[in-house]
Amino acid sequence: MSNKNKKIVQGEEDEEEDDLYDDYDDKPKTTTTTTTSTSMNKSDSNISLNKEMLINDHPEDLIVGANSPLNVSVTTTPIENINENPSPVNLDEQTQQTQPQQNPISPITPLSSSSPSSSTTTTTITNSAVSPSNILITPTQSPIEIKPIIETQQPLPSPPQQGPSPIILQHQQQQQPLQSQYITPPIPQPQYQPIASQQSQQPQQIPTRKLSGSQMLPQRIPLSLGENKLKEFNENLRKSYCTKTHMLYYSINKEVSGANQHLTGVIDLIKSVQHNIRQYNDDILTLEEKLEQTEWSLQYYFNNNSNNNS
């Protein structure tokens, strides 16, 4: 990689800068053009980069105002075996919106390994205003990325050659990917429906049996009046049965409660009789004891009398 005609402008002393600013006010707009040519050959691995920078005789022309807008113009020439016609893009400074023009994009043909290729890029920077700030522009070297191109089995047909269209950008350069005109349509896929859904879509047929005139079923005659009376009778019977069962339950419960009370009275009476019998037994025991005492006393008395008489 080699650089040609490269000039770097450095700042001068204070006395020369005053003269430069005075002369620059009376001079027209300046133009700086940078031309970069790149040659690529697949057979050789050498890549040569030649840069040419054309600068006016006056060094003060390189001073660009910081607040002044820049107009950048980039022109790209296609490679010999590649026919490109990119659509020009216009970027508005105020709205910053891209407006692509309607130009067809030609397909890219594959590169052969033996044929050389060349590409040239030209960049033009134009200053439209002047400000006191000093900005020095120096060329910079940027590496070039080489991407291999995969050859397809069937090369696309090459359309007729057309002249390159310029791309005008303001403030910044945007790269848009190329889109091929030939787009493969999607392969239609067969739609499969399950057997259950197919069966559900078919109308269901109910098997019916044909009857002759003699075998026809008799039609039911609606008895609305009799049915209503039967319903009323059933309802009344249910109500009466419920009331009777409730009354019987209440009466049985009342009788049982009365019998319980009577039994409690009888039990109390029996308890009182038992108590009286116990008292009677005690009285009888006391009487027996008294009788025995009287007997002993009488025997003692008779014995004493007999002894006295003897």
Swiss-Prot record:
Residues 37-49, 78-88 have a biased composition (Polar residues). Residues 1-53, 78-127, 153-217 are annotated as: Disordered. This is Uncharacterized protein DDB_G0292106. The keyword Coiled coil applies. GO terms for cellular component: BLOC-1 complex. InterPro entries: BLOC-1_complex_su-3 (IPR017245). Residues 11-25 have a biased composition (Acidic residues). Residues 268-299 form a coiled coil. It comes from Dictyostelium discoideum (Social amoeba). Residues 94-126, 164-184, 192-208 have a biased composition (Low complexity). Keywords: Coiled coil.
